[in-house]
A protein has these predicted regions:
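Boundary detector for helix-to-coil junctions that initiate low-complexity/charged tails
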Residues: 1, 263, 671-775
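A conserved mid-protein helix/loop that constitutes part of the nucleotide-sugar donor-binding site
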Residues: 45, 309-314, 485-508, 518, ...
């Protein structure tokens, strides 16, 4: 999996650097459900890489039709002969003569035995989960006729390509659609497929325009699936790729498909999730995969920067190193900026919102669990995972299930994810927690103490360790003196980490101490506010706002800093405290959650929170002022913290402990008396779960519209002279009406739903809008 921020174009899907899941069918060769079509003309040895990327697909219900378009080079024919008898799913079709790539594709498509056609060139590569996600996308979205994803260009030219079917009408001016894709067979049958008169390239551009002209179109999944091999001069292979010929061919397209260039383009509206929508129960296939290692399914909300995800990544790393296969499934819409971090250790990663409608989540999970035959399922911070527990238990009564929680959240769902643990503990074999504090919290509220197992998240003490050399280098690069006290605030900049408290504390300390510097490493919704605060209060010389930083840089920042300051609103035990102490930093944090299980008075300060913000600011400021006045104490506490973490909280101890918990979960489950869950009841629970999530998503979207609207109202109220003096009253009224109706169109579908709650604040918005726009 490629890191879009720092792409490694050598780490292709067939690179030995990639983690190996060893996908292959269990038992007999499965019946094909997709047909891969590949034209082959003297490709040669590079074809072995393409073949490897096909053979290692996670979806094994395929057939591969390789159309030999009259190859003549002996070496190329020898390569092709290797695949004639390698696998019964591979069929080499020998054309009577060289007929051109369009004819070769059409020939293979006619020979295909399935309703789904995958187009793949003989020198390109596919990510291992490509076919599986494309197949399920077209199953979940019957209104779309084809699908693809983003592409990685490698070879002579390296770049990332994000355009495709999502670009819509841009296809009329430029061939923005990558060739590799999955299409419904019917589009070829109804349009005739590729133009066989085109033998010099661009036949795929013509195909996309032909399909659009016939009313067919597709969608782009926001993931990298296809690796496109580039050459120094593409026109050496295809004459039509020369700039002049491209311009000429655009004129040809205008003549062939005039209605496209006169304004027509297929508009396909995705079917949105409906109220109380029936949940499909049928799964299309088993896709039973061979298994020779233990397997864990990890259900998480997303893959984003944060302590919980760092723990998940380290767990996946350790388990795969111990011989486990780990599959990761995420359930919330997200850009998943840390997906590549998980991808270092497993390629079996599925972000359900990227390729499935909400209603298809339950049957996909049923299919997925059957396909992989997991030894255990682990749920962590995943609300949908909890809501689907009755369904999972009903479908798989012999499957051990555990969860893992880091912290309670009293102001969200009466306790956060641990509250869901309490609600669904009957379905859990083991309850995992990251602190004794959280264990006590659960037991006090009715959890079965016998089920609870504790594992601290711990830290890599070799990676996070003092480095005088890095300290000097980083400080020199930032213009900071070697003996200058440096305070680090490393966190997501949002309400849970209290950036407003942090900022006011620094402002207070700066008034009495002029010799220290602050580094802020992190991003989040409150970063713009923090930036404004720093500027408005003249703290630019004292505070460096670094934004989100990659993990290697975070290691260096900790090595260059002296004090970690994190005034959290709530925590379990913040992972960044483990990292800071391992790096030799003194820590100043909040006395919340289980943090005193890690931070002792010898290592740092934990400050009691206060309902009075001013008092809380005073408490933190007093601690920091005292430390800055006693630099030797900072160093002493840093050394003590390092010693404590090395002795008690090493990362390998976490890995071993989690393996113990997993083994215990499996053993406990199989020692239990059989439990019987109603399959019908499980499906009913799944329907209720999906309706709950659907309503949540709609309300969240409506709330965002409300916030945007109120921000716009405030801006409109502040700009009383928004209209030029020369505007007539009629012109001004028309503009006001236009803006009002734009707001109404975007917001009021959600207003109507949210108004049912009876909230006076929401119900007043309509009148406020009219008042602001003087209507």
């Amino acid at each position: 999996m490629i890191n879009p921020q720092r792409p490694d174009f050598e780490n292709t899907p067939v690179s030995p650097q990639r983690p190996e899941y060893r996908y292959r069918p269990a038992g007999e060769t499965p019946a094909p459900l997709v047909s891969i079509v590949t034209p082959y003309y003297n490709t040669g040895a590079i074809f072995h890489e393409t073949a490897r990327s096909v053979l290692q697909q996670s979806f094994q219900h395929w057939e591969w039709l390789i159309a030999n378009d009259g190859s003549t080079v002996p070496e190329a024919l020898e390569v092709l002969d290797h695949y004639r008898s390698l696998d019964p799913r591979i069929r080499v079709i020998d054309l009577p003569r060289n007929m051109g790539t369009s004819a070769a594709k059409n020939w293979a498509i006619r020979e295909a035995r399935t309703d789904l056609i995958v187009l793949l060139d003989s020198d390109d590569l596919l990510e291992p989960t490509t076919l599986e996600k494309w197949f399920w996308f077209l199953l979940s979205y019957p209104e779309w006729y084809f699908v693809q994803g983003w592409s990685v260009a490698f070879g002579a030219n390296n770049y990332l390509w994000h355009r495709g079917f999502c670009s819509g009408r841009e296809i009329l001016q430029e061939n923005v659609v990558d060739y590799a894709s999955m299409l419904r067979r019917e589009v070829f049958e109804k349009t005739g497929g590729f133009n066989e008169d085109m033998r010099t390239g661009l036949e795929d551009w013509d195909l996309w325009c032909k399909l659009a002209n016939a009313g067919f179109w597709g969608q782009t999944i926001p993931e990298y699936f296809k690796w496109y091999r580039t050459r120094e001069n593409h026109s050496e292979k295809w004459e039509a790729w020369q700039p002049k010929r491209l311009a000429e061919f655009r004129e040809v397209l205008k003549e062939r498909y005039p209605r496209l260039y006169e304004g027509y383009f297929p508009e396909i509206d995705p079917v949105e999730s409906a109220e109380n929508e029936p949940i499909p129960e049928e799964i299309p296939c088993e896709n039973a995969l061979a298994k020779d290692r233990k397997r864990l399914l990890l259900l998480i909300p997303w893959m984003v920067t944060g302590g919980a995800d760092k723990f998940n990544i380290e767990l996946v790393k350790y388990l795969t190193g111990q011989g486990w296969d780990v599959s990761v499934v995420t359930t919330k819409p997200s850009e998943n900026e840390w997906a590549y971090e998980y991808g270092h250790y497993t390629g079996d990663i599925f972000s359900l919102p990227n390729f499935l409608r909400l209603r298809d989540y339950p049957r996909f999970l049923r299919y997925f669990i059957q396909s992989r035959r997991f030894d255990a399922v682990m749920i962590t911070n995943c609300e949908l995972g909890y809501l689907l527990l009755p369904f999972i238990r009903a479908q798989f009564p012999d499957l051990p299930v555990l969860d893992f929680n880091h912290a309670e959240a009293e102001d969200w769902k009466s306790g956060g994810y641990p509250r869901l643990t309490l609600t669904f503990q009957h379905y859990l074999d083991t309850i995992g927690v990251s602190s004794l504090h959280l264990k006590d919290w659960l037991v006090e509220r009715g959890a079965d103490a016998r089920k609870i197992e504790t594992c601290y998240v711990n830290v890599d003490t070799d990676l996070f360790a003092p480095s005088p050399e890095n300290r000097r280098r980083v400080r020199a690069g930032m213009g900071l003196a070697e003996d200058l006290p440096v305070i680090l605030y490393a966190a997501r900049i949002d309400i849970e980490k209290q950036p407003r408290v942090f900022a006011r504390v620094i402002q207070r300390v700066a008034a009495s101490h002029d010799r220290f510097h602050v580094l802020v490493a992190g991003d989040g919704p409150d970063l713009p506010w923090l930036r404004s605060f720093v500027q408005e209060n003249g703290l630019e010389e004292r505070v460096s706002l670094l934004g989100a930083v990659p993990r290697p840089r975070m290691v260096e920042l900790m090595q260059a800093s002296d004090i970690l300051f994190l005034p959290s609103l709530r925590e379990g035990i913040a992972l960044v405290l483990f990292e800071a102490m391992a790096s030799g930093m003194c820590v100043v944090g909040a006395d919340v959650g289980g943090q005193k299980e890690l931070v002792t008075p010898e290592c740092g300060y934990l400050v009691c929170r206060s309902d009075d913000p001013e008092e809380e600011v005073e408490r933190y400021a007093a601690v920091l002022e005292d430390l800055l006045a006693n630099p030797e104490r900072i160093a002493t506490m840093g050394r003590a913290g390092r010693e404590r973490v090395v002795e008690n909280f090493r990362l390998e101890d976490m890995g071993r402990r989690m393996c113990e918990i997993l083994d215990h979960t499996i053993q406990v489950h199989h020692r239990r008396h059989p439990s019987f869950y109603s399959v019908d009841g499980g499906w009913s629970a799944a329907a209720m779960a999906m309706e709950t999530i659907r309503l949540q998503l709609e309300l969240i979207e409506g709330w965002r519209y409300r916030v945007e609207l109120e921000n716009a109202l405030q801006a409109a109220q502040a700009q009383t002279a928004a209209f030029p003096a020369h505007f007539t009253p009629v012109e001004t009224l028309r503009i006001r009406q236009l803006v009002y109706h734009l707001f109404r169109k975007s917001f009021f579908p959600y207003y109507n739903r949210m108004g049912l709650s009876g909230s006076d604040r929401i119900l007043r918005i309509k009148e406020r809008v009219k008042k602001v726009f003087d209507l």
